[in-house]
């Protein structure tokens, strides 16, 4: 029978000092012996996805206390990728994932907490907390802040839905008037919550459902809706049950590594492919799997991508649907239900509610459930009122979207495409693979061949695109932007958005060892591995070289002879200390970022730290 971890600090005469300090936080004699549960919040006023979280930790804590536990809250940092985008701030985004994971480990282990409730939401916060949870392997429940409502505005006498990406594209399009750009900017992000499309934040919050570590509805129920409050209340109650099951009944099924098993990771990736999630999810699932000591690799993702169809299409891949529409169609469980009927899921998995996948679908799949409360929850909709307050409205759709032939979520028979929304490509300059969000690629450019235009920074590429130096048919290559080379593996949302604003969204390709925002669409291929700074062949591409992309056949090729590539590699090595570094880039890199770069691995490994360099 495992002992409560917290007993280390609450029991024994020699722990009098620790108990004295616990008493100063409000604990009393009756609390010593109860499980101490960390409420890991991520409130910040910098990020709309987190601006409403200040009081939500208190909601969880009250339920923990009422259920027989002791709640202790702390905060992590949270970077807003959209605000950090397009300047040096983006260098810090991915490294913040590691800082978040470490800070959770530090706080939980330093104070011997027994379990956690993780209140996350945006791009690197959910992955960082997920990595920490699987590293620590103590009972945990995730509950995120929820998606933002889609923006709406009237253009050309037509009401259209908007999101952050629309504001970026219109702001860079010289054909758009200042008045229209301003109108879109003011309408794009109307409420608190994670940006309203199937971007990285919402993708990851959906994946925690598929992993079994969060409750049904977590990924899609709007931040503003009153129904979301119940997820927080339930999390506080349920975590005490999970904690007591493990520590008092020796039930290891309550631990995250036994919930988020290899089978659960495969289900999560299957969901990701079917819903056309952000390419960043690949990076984060690979990293989380390593923390869980699960053998889950790019090869597994490649195999899944070849058999899973696309059953859901959401912004940025279409403007018709946003997360509020996914929720109306049944959310994550709606997609999982269709995947299950197609025989594409591992059914022998459980979630934090203790339900197997078939049991969960029976209760929460809107096409089969008899539970009217569940149907009501999935009718939760937007109010269209600007607010930063959680649970501030109770609007509902008149009906559910259960049309699996022409609705937001489709059945296998009516899939958007037989190929899924993500694909792994391999070739002679991506020997370890690269990732493309096929959900956002127009059918006309699934096969694309063109001359390379090579840039050694995102900034140079943006200048060239806006300056008209990139033309129809070009393959833009942005290198030395990987985890080590950036450092920090910047997102390339601005280059892809600016290609669209210049009318080149379906006429060019963009390839990088960096990564893309979940808001990216178009022929945007990232995570090229090995990266340029690690000796990757992408560093040897020159202007004018022909690159051939063949998504249906999962191929990407630099059309040069092996002899020519070998000669260029030899010339690169001859640069000595300057080999595998950008030639003409001026970039200030802080000590913190240099420390990150010194241990960073390529994207095919999840851009985690290289344990072998630390003797691990």
Curated annotation (Swiss-Prot):
Q: Does the keyword Isomerase apply?
A: no
**Ranges in a coiled coil:** none
- Functional summary from the UniProt entry: Functions in the biosynthesis of branched-chain amino acids. Catalyzes the dehydration of (2R,3R)-2,3-dihydroxy-3-methylpentanoate (2,3-dihydroxy-3-methylvalerate) into 2-oxo-3-methylpentanoate (2-oxo-3-methylvalerate) and of (2R)-2,3-dihydroxy-3-methylbutanoate (2,3-dihydroxyisovalerate) into 2-oxo-3-methylbutanoate (2-oxoisovalerate), the penultimate precursor to L-isoleucine and L-valine, respectively.
GO MF terms listed in the record are: 2 iron, 2 sulfur cluster binding; dihydroxy-acid dehydratase activity; hydro-lyase activity; magnesium ion binding
Annotated residues that bind Mg(2+) are located at: 81, 123-124, 491
Pfam families linked to this entry: ILV_EDD_C (PF24877), ILVD_EDD_N (PF00920)
| Protein family | Belongs to the IlvD/Edd family.
Q: Which PROSITE patterns match?
A: ILVD_EDD_1 (PS00886), ILVD_EDD_2 (PS00887)
Q: Which domain of life is it from?
A: Bacteria
| Alphabetically ordered keywords of this record | 2Fe-2S, Amino-acid biosynthesis, Branched-chain amino acid biosynthesis, Iron, Iron-sulfur, Lyase, Magnesium, Metal-binding
Q: Name one GO biological process term.
A: L-valine biosynthetic process
Please give the cofactor(s) recorded in the UniProt entry for this protein: [2Fe-2S] cluster; Mg(2+)
- Where [2Fe-2S] cluster binds, per the record, is at 122, 195
Q: What is this protein called?
A: Dihydroxy-acid dehydratase
Check the record and name the HAMAP family matching this protein: IlvD
Q: Which organism is it from?
A: Salmonella typhimurium (strain LT2 / SGSC1412 / ATCC 700720)
Can you list the GO cellular component terms from the UniProt entry? cytosol
Which Enzyme Commission number(s) are on file for it? 4.2.1.9
Spell out the subunit comment.
Homodimer.
Q: In which pathway does it act?
A: Amino-acid biosynthesis; L-isoleucine biosynthesis; L-isoleucine from 2-oxobutanoate: step 3/4; Amino-acid biosynthesis; L-valine biosynthesis; L-valine from pyruvate: step 3/4
- List the top taxonomic levels of the source: Bacteria, Pseudomonadati, Pseudomonadota, Gammaproteobacteria, Enterobacterales
> So where's the catalytic machinery, residue-wise?
517 (proton acceptor)
Write out the catalysed reaction: (2R)-2,3-dihydroxy-3-methylbutanoate = 3-methyl-2-oxobutanoate + H2O; (2R,3R)-2,3-dihydroxy-3-methylpentanoate = (S)-3-methyl-2-oxopentanoate + H2O
In the record, which positions carry N6-carboxylysine?
Answer: 124
What does the Swiss-Prot or TrEMBL cofactor note state? Binds 1 [2Fe-2S] cluster per subunit. This cluster acts as a Lewis acid cofactor.
């Amino acid at each position: 029978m495992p002992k409560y971890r917290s007993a280390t600090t609450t029991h024994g005469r020699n722990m009098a000092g620790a108990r004295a300090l616990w008493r100063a936080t409000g604990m009393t004699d009756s609390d010593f012996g109860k499980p101490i549960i960390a409420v890991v919040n991520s409130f910040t006023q910098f990020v709309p996805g987190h601006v409403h979280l200040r009081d939500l930790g208190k909601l969880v804590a009250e339920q923990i206390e009422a259920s027989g536990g002791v709640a202790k809250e702390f905060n992590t940092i949270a970077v807003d990728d959209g605000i950090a985008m397009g300047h040096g701030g983006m260098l810090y985004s991915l490294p913040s994932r590691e800082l978040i994971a470490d800070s959770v480990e530090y706080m939980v282990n330093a104070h011997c907490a027994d379990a956690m409730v993780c209140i996350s939401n945006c791009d690197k916060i959910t992955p960082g907390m997920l990595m920490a949870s699987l590293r620590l392997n103590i009972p945990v429940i995730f509950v995120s802040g929820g998606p933002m409502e889609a923006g709406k505005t009237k253009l050309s006498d037509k009401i259209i839905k908007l999101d952050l990406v629309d504001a970026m594209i219109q702001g860079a399009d010289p054909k758009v008037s200042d008045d229209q750009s301003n109108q879109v900017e003011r309408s794009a992000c109307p409420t608190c919550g994670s940006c309203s499309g199937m971007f990285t934040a919402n993708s990851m919050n959906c994946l925690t459902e598929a992993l079994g570590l969060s409750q049904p509805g977590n990924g899609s129920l709007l931040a503003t809706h009153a129904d979301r409050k119940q997820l927080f209340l339930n999390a506080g109650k349920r975590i005490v049950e999970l904690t007591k099951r493990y520590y008092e009944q020796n039930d290891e099924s309550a631990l995250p590594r036994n919930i988020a098993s290899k089978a659960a990771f495969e289900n999560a990736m299957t969901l990701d492919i079917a819903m056309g999630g952000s390419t960043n999810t690949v990076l984060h699932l690979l990293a989380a799997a390593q923390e869980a000591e699960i053998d889950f690799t790019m090869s597994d993702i490649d195999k899944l991508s070849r058999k899973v169809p696309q059953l859901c299409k959401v912004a940025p891949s279409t403007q018709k649907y946003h997360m509020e529409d996914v929720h109306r169609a049944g959310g994550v469980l709606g997609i999982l239900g269709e995947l299950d009927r197609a025989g594409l899921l591992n059914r022998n998995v459980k979630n934090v509610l203790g339900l197997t996948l078939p049991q969960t679908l029976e209760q929460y799949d809107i096409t089969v459930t008899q539970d009217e409360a569940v149907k009501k929850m999935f009718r939760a909709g937007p109010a269209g009122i600007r607010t930063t307050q959680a649970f501030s409205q109770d609007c509902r759709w008149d009906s559910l979207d259960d049309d699996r032939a022409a609705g937001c979520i489709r059945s296998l028979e009516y899939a958007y495409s037989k190929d899924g929304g993500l694909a792994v490509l391999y070739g002679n300059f991506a020997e370890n693979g690269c990732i493309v969000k096929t959900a956002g690629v127009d059918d006309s450019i699934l096969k694309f061949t063109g001359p390379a235009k090579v840039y050694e920074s995102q900034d140079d590429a943006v200048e060239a695109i806006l300056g008209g130096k990139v033309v129809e048919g070009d393959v833009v290559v942005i290198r030395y932007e990987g985890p080590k080379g950036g450092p920090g593996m910047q997102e390339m949302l601005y280059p892809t958005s600016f290609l669209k604003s210049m009318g080149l969204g379906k006429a060019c390709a963009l390839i990088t060892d960096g990564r893309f925002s979940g808001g990216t669409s178009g022929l945007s291929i990232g995570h090229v591995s090995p990266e340029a700074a690690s000796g990757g062949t992408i560093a040897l591409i020159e202007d004018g070289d022909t690159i051939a992309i063949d998504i249906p056949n999962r191929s990407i090729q630099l059309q040069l002879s092996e002899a020519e590539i070998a000669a260029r590699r030899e010339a690169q090595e001859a640069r000595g200390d300057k080999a595998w570094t950008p030639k003409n880039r001026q970039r200030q890199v802080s000590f913190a970022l240099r420390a990150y770069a010194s241990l960073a691995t390529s994207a095919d490994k999840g851009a985690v730290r290289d344990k072998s360099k630390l003797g691990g």
